[in-house]
Amino acid sequence: APTSDRSLEGVSQKKLELYNKYYTALVHLEQRVKHTKWCILRYPNEYFSRKSNMSLNDFKDFYYKVCNIDYNKMKIAMEPLKELMNKTDKVHIVAPGTDLIFSIKDIPAEKYYGTFNIPDGEVATCPVKNSVNGYITYNTKTKYNDIIFEDIRFDFIDGKIVKATAKENSKTLNEILDTDEGARYIG
């Protein structure tokens, strides 16, 4: 189990790109995910309790409760949302720092209920590629290749991120989005 979220600190961006290209893409995504049975479980420890701002005992109690829910019951309870999403065309999200509209028409919704991840629970789909317009701001920190990004804002026109900013590391964020022609699109 991890003890830090900075385990890759000091590794060059070039080496991280090679790792993602030759290990993550080829070994993990192409071989392991597609050809083996797997389930991801992040065992509760001090690191995860700190990240959750909880004591270790409180975090363990919370974690085991969400891991031991009735996933078959969840699967059934998700069906009305899946049906609604499958007949929905336009989605409009409005929140502080966000006004985003897109289509999910004819993109099938999928239910996730403990088959590959524990804990789990979501009904997911994605936008029609060129339908995303507006902007979204993320109010939580995120990490990519050991770089922390905070207050990310993406502005979209016809599905493409045309402007990307962050509190810090905006230049790096845009370099990541410029890695290939699909990186500025959702889906």
Identify the residue ranges that each predicted region occupies.
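Short acidic-glycine loop/turn motifs at beta-strand connectors
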Residues: 96-97, 104-106, 156-160, 165
